[in-house]
Amino acid sequence: MIPSYDPNDTEAGLKLLEDLTTNAEAIQQQVLHQILSQNSGTQYLRAFLDGEADKNQQSFKNKVPVVNYDDVKPFIQRIADGESSDIVSAQPITELLTSSGTSAGKPKLMPSTAEELERKTFFYSMLVPIMNKYVDGLDEGKGMYLLFIKPEIKTPSGLMARPVLTSYYKSQHFRNRPFNKYNVYTSPDQTILCQDSKQSMYCQLLCGLVQRSHVLRVGAVFASAFLRAVKFLEDHYKELCADIRTGTVTSWITDSSCRDSVLSILNGPNQELADEIESECAEKSWEGILRRIWPKAKYVEVIVTGSMAQYIPTLEFYSGGLPLVSTMYASSECYFGINLNPLCDPADVSYTLLPNMAYFEFLPVDDKSHEEIHFATHSNTDDDDDALKEDLIVNLVNVEVGQYYEIVITTFTGLYRYRVGDILKVTGFHNKAPQFRFVQRRNVVLSIDTDKTSEEDLLNAVTQAKLNHLQHPSSLLLTEYTSYADTSSIPGHYVLFWELKPRHSNDPPKLDDKTMEDCCSEVEDCLDYVYRRCRNRDKSIGPLEIRVVSLGTFDSLMDFCVSQGSSLNQYKTPRCVKSGGALEILDSRVIGRFFSKRVPQWEPLGLDS
C-alpha cells in the first residue's frame, strides 16, 4: 500500500496523485482489509472481532467502537512499560510518538512502526511534484528550511518517545534520503540534528545567509517557528554578519559537528556579502525583510492553518508579498493530506486526504457550535445511549461539501476508530477524494506554538492560582476571567483578563505586585507538559500575563456579545476571546498588568502511568 516513484519525475508524481484520488473508495477498502488482516490477532482487536479478520466495512463498524485517547492509553502504556507490541500491532512498535495534546498533563503517546516511516517518506515525496506544477525552476537553487529536533524520552520498555518530526529527522529515511534536485536544503543535517535549539537556529540561519543567492524558498514547519527565526535574526544579525565577514563561527557554537559543517559552507571570509546583509538588517523597518535578504525566494512555506492562522498578518509584513504556502496536514497520529493549490490565499487552504495513508471515517458535528452530534464513544456510554449511531459515521468518499466533521482514523500502527479531535469542513473534491479546511482542534482555547490548552486545563490552573494566592492574605475574589493568545510580539504569550474585587467591600481592588506575579507563575506551573516545554526548553512562548480589569468589565463584554447576536438567556462568558471588539472592551478597562517572573519547571520525564 506504499506506492513509489522517482521524486525527480514530476509527471510521474502527478499521475500517481491522480490514480490515488480517482480510486479513493477502492483504496480505502484495501487499506481496511490490510489493517485487519495484519492486526485481527492483536489483543485489542480480538476483544471485538474474536480473532477473525472480518474485513467488511460495516461489520468492522458494528463491532469495533469509536474511542478517544483515554480508552487506548492503558494499552499503549503497557507497551511503553515493556509488554509485547501485539497488544495493538502485529508489527513491532519501534517508537512512541509524543503528541502535542496531553492526557492528565502528560504527553499522549502514539505507537509507530518502521513501515510507518516509509509511509511518511512517501507522503513527503508527494509534496514536491505539486510545488513543481505551480512554481518553475525549483531545481535551480535551494530551500532555507529551518528544521529542529526536540528532546526524547526513554520509556521503561527501552522504546524512545519523541515528537513525530524529531522521529522523522533522526530516521535513516531522512538522513540517507536520495538526492532530489527539487528539494535541496541550505542547512546541513548536522545543524538540523543539533540538540541545542539556539545553536541549531544560529547555524541554520548562518548557512541560509551565506547561500542567499541560491535560496529559492524559505520556511519552517509552523508559522510560529519561522517567526521565532525572524526575531532571532533581528537579535543576532550583527554577530551573524561578523562570522560571514571573517569566515569563522562564533565561539559559543560548541557543537563540533555544527561548527565543522558550517565552516565548510562559509569557505572563508566574505566582506561584501556581510555588508549587504547588515545594510538590509540595519534598516529601521523590517517590512519585506525576507524578500530583501533572499531576493530570489519565490514563497514562504509554513503551516498557517488552524491556530497558526493568527500569524498570517505578521508573516505578510515580513514577507514583502511572497506567497505563504501551507503544503500539508499531519499529526502524531497520522499524516492526512496535502494542499493541491499551494499558492492559494492562506484563508482558502484545503487539504486533499490521501486515501492510502489510513482508513478514514468522519463524525458529523454541528456547523454552528462544532459540538458533536449526539452519539456515544466507547468510554462514555449510558444505559439509554450505549449504541453508536452507525448511520452518522461517514466514510471518506461519502462526506458532504459544506458539512463539518471530526476525523476518526484506523491506522496501520495500532489505532482503531480513534478520534483525533480535529474539526474539518469539506470544501470540495479532487476526483473522488474529499478536500477539507482545518477548522479547529476540539476543546482547545489557547495555542501559541505546539501547545494546546483546553478550557478545562485553563480552569484548573486559574483555580489553583486563586486558591493559593488570592484568598490569603489578599482576600480578593476572582469574579470572572477570560483569555487570549497574544501574538503581537515574538514569542507570543498567554494573556488572562481577571476581574477582581475585595471580599468585604465594593472598592477597587488593591493589587500587590508580588501576589499577582505569583498568580501568573502558579497558572504556568499548572499548565501541561507541552506548554511548560515550550516555555522552558523551546523558548517558543513568552511569560504569561494577567491583566486585571475594572469592576463591571465583564458586564460590558456580555452587552457587546449580545449586541453581536448572542442569546442573553444562553450567554456564558467566553473563556477565550478572538473578536477585535471584545478585546478592545477588555483592554480599555485594564487597571493593572503583571507577568510571570520565573520559568515553569519542565523535565523530559514522567511518562509513567
UniProtKB/Swiss-Prot annotation:
Enzyme Commission number(s) from the entry: 6.3.2.-
Keywords attached to this entry: Ligase
Enzyme class, UniProt record, top EC level: ligase
GO biological process, one term: response to auxin
Family the UniProt entry places it in: Belongs to the IAA-amido conjugating enzyme family.
Functional summary from the UniProt entry: Catalyzes the synthesis of indole-3-acetic acid (IAA)-amino acid conjugates, providing a mechanism for the plant to cope with the presence of excess auxin. Strongly reactive with Glu, Gln, Trp, Asp, Ala, Leu, Phe, Gly, Tyr, Met, Ile and Val. Appears to favor Glu over Asp while the other GH3 favor Asp over Glu. Little or no product formation with His, Ser, Thr, Arg, Lys, or Cys. Also active on pyruvic and butyric acid analogs of IAA, PAA and the synthetic auxin naphthaleneacetic acid (NAA).
Name by which UniProt lists this protein: Indole-3-acetic acid-amido synthetase GH3.17
Species whose genome carries this gene: Arabidopsis thaliana
